Structure formats: C-alpha cells, structure tokens
Amino acid sequence: MDKIVIHGGNRLKGEVRISGAKNSALPLLFATLLAPGQHQLENVPALRDISTAGKLLSILGAEVHSQEGVFSVDATRIRSVEAPYDLVRTMRASVLVLGPLLARLGHARVSLPGGCAIGARPINLHLKGLEAMGAEIDLDHGYVEARAKRLHGANIYLDIPTVGGTENLLMAACLAQGTTVIENAACEPEIVDLATALTCMGARIEGAGTDRIVVEGVDELQPLHYAVMPDRIEAGTFMVAAAMTRGDVRLLGARQADLEALISKLQEAGVTISAEDHALRVRGPRRIAPVDIKTQPHPGFPTDMQAQFMALMSIADGTSVVTESVFENRFMHVCELQRLGADIAIEGKTAKVRGVKELLGAPVMATDLRASASLVLAGLAAENTTEVSRIYHLDRGYERLEEKFRNLGAHIERIKG
C-alpha cells in the first residue's frame, strides 16, 4: 500500500495551478446522460473518483474517452439503467446518475452509495423529491429502483440544503414536464457550475446559487461542451499549507468569490491574502493567531476545510474552538494529529485546540479524504519525518498533490507499497 513520506520544515514558495473541481466534474459527467450526442468536458482532474465515474458511464453504455484533462462522452446509446454496487460502494456521488437516467429513460436502478465514512449522509431527500415529481421508487436488496413515464414539475422543499440532492433534482427537473421549484436548495459554487452547464445544454434554470431554484422543463437537451470550475477545496488546502509553513504561494486559477469564508478566517489568523490576475497570493505569518470556526453550508465555512484548518490551529499561539455542524463523525483525524503532538480535546461536535510550539513527525494513518490532507499539511509543518499511510483516500480528491507540493519546495515523496 502506498504511503507519503514528508521531511517537514521547508517554507513553501512559488506558484501552483489549481486543478478542476472534483465536486463539479462528477455531476457534470453524469449530466451527459441527459442528452444523446458527443459531449466534451475540459479541466477534468485525474482522480480515482473521476475514473470510477468514467467506468460507470461506460457500464451504462456511453462511449468514454479521456486524455490530459479532457473527457469525451457519447451518451447516445445508453444500454443499461443499473449502477452496480461494486462501483457505487466506492463513490457515493454515483447516486447522481439516478436523476438523469430517470428523466431521460424513465427507469433507473442504483445501488445505495458508499464513499467516505463520515456519517450516514442518507439519500432520502433525493428520493422524496423525485417522488414529488412523479417517480415510483422501491428499495430492494440494497438498490433504489425508480420508474416514471415522464417526470412532472413539483414544489420541493429540502429539509436540509443537501448538495447531492439539489444536483440530482436539478438534473431531473430539466427534462420534467412543467415547472419545478427547489426550496432550501444548496448554494455551493458547484451547484452554480452545474446549472450554468445545464443552461448551455438548453435547460431553463433561475436562482442557482440561492436557496430557491426554479427549473422550467424542456423536451430535450443538447450535448455539453464545458470547462470545469477550479477546485476551491484544493485551493483552500494550499492556502492553509502556505500559512502553516510561513510560505509565499500564488494559486493560479483560484477564485476569491468561492473562498470568502475561508479567506476571512485565514486573515483573522494573521495570513496575508491578496487577489492578483486570475490568482490568489498567500503569505503565512510568523505567528498564527487562534481562530474559532463553525462549519456551515455555503456561504459558511466549508466542512471540507475543517480538518485542514484544525491542523493550522494546532500550531496557533493560543486556544481555538472548531465546531462541526454539517456531518457527524468528522473528527477522525484528531487522533492522528495527536500522534504528531497536537493538543486537541473533543466534546460532542466541538474540538478545543490548544496550539503547540511545534509538531513532531510520526507515522500516521489517513481515515478519509480531507483528514488525509490535514495530515499531509501537519507533516509539512512538523519537525523530522512524517509518514502518511492509506493515502488512497487522498487520491480520491487531490490531483498529483505530492508533486505540486514538491514543486513548491516541500521535501515529500510517494513510496509505492
């Protein structure tokens, strides 16, 4: 099994190109199921989850080709409506084929999802919304089976602003008959990116990026030609890395508007951040000030940056409080950070982080995608050598991470196992 070995203590300096956003690329790939013809997506990151999505599209009958960040998908001949367990169990985003298959073909059979083990994250809100649009849904031996002659518009209220649920219902509504209104919709930038792409295909959508999205269904959509937005979580991870190493890093392609909550908290911690031409420049402080955060749906502080920010606070000059309000069971990285010398105490959904003067390298084990990133960041700032195992989690969400850090001056390498 591969591991990453880090000899910490180097200041990060230079430029890094931010990859396309995984959390945008996945729904965009599955949106190709909505229309026959040749689709093309650019700026697609080379990640394990993206590869899984390509395999799933191929199983369904699409012709998929990829080369250097460009995906070509011909979704003309969809032969199957089943997303099998063997694929879906490795990536919960696979459930996003449910809405497109049901809307275009009137039938979908999708295994219940897997992915990171950070809480239940049920898909009941997806199913409740599709039922409101006229779908008949059965749960059978771990599969969701959905049927509808044609979906119809509906007024849907989401009990929580689920990103995946909003995406699934948004895609399904594009081919539904009549008007669909999604209330308490997720507002994440990836929702806006999906809606923009669907509009390019001929969909009629208003309100994406707000908590009320209105979709006027159309009879058919056209093939998609689109470039995936930059990954705000990757950008945020490099911002924290620069802060932890007292670095000076330019993030090429990073968009300030997608990162306002994180930028605000980093500046509160003493980090200097400036917008430049299609880039953000991040300069770490000599002293990191303690900052309290509470994760919230967008535009609040992103839960996908909680673990990385906790790593930063572990070397702050004082005590901070981290509250996780989006997912349960998302403090699994704490035990591993403690192995590096972090002083963290958990009480329910809150972690009290007492900053220490320095972290010391040690063998640690990744437990999920963002936890693995936090351990790499801690290793970059720690004295001596840190080994991070189970990095297959990391490969689900970061493209060539160790190479990018190495180009910024980090002493980091991947050891094949």
Swiss-Prot record:
The active site is at residue 116. UDP-N-acetyl-alpha-D-glucosamine binds at residues 92, 304, 326. Phosphoenolpyruvate binds at residues 22-23. It is found in: Cytoplasm. Keywords: Cell cycle, Cell division, Cell shape, Cell wall biogenesis/degradation, Cytoplasm, Peptidoglycan synthesis, Pyruvate, Transferase. GO terms for molecular function: UDP-N-acetylglucosamine 1-carboxyvinyltransferase activity. GO terms for cellular component: cytoplasm. It catalyses: phosphoenolpyruvate + UDP-N-acetyl-alpha-D-glucosamine = UDP-N-acetyl-3-O-(1-carboxyvinyl)-alpha-D-glucosamine + phosphate. It holds the Pfam family EPSP_synthase. The modification 2-(S-cysteinyl)pyruvic acid O-phosphothioketal is found at residue 116. GO terms for biological process: cell division; cell wall organization; peptidoglycan biosynthetic process; regulation of cell shape; UDP-N-acetylgalactosamine biosynthetic process. Pathway: Cell wall biogenesis; peptidoglycan biosynthesis. Its EC number is 2.5.1.7. InterPro entries: Enolpyruvate_Tfrase_dom (IPR001986), Enolpyruvate_Tfrase_sf (IPR036968), MurA_subfamily (IPR050068), RNA3'P_cycl/enolpyr_Trfase_a/b (IPR013792), UDP_GlcNAc_COvinyl_MurA (IPR005750). Gene3D superfamilies: Enolpyruvate transferase domain. NCBIfam families: murA, PRK09369.1. PANTHER family: UDP-N-ACETYLGLUCOSAMINE 1-CARBOXYVINYLTRANSFERASE (PTHR43783:SF1). Cell wall formation. Adds enolpyruvyl to UDP-N-acetylglucosamine. Belongs to the EPSP synthase family. MurA subfamily. This is UDP-N-acetylglucosamine 1-carboxyvinyltransferase. It comes from Syntrophotalea carbinolica (strain DSM 2380 / NBRC 103641 / GraBd1) (Pelobacter carbinolicus).
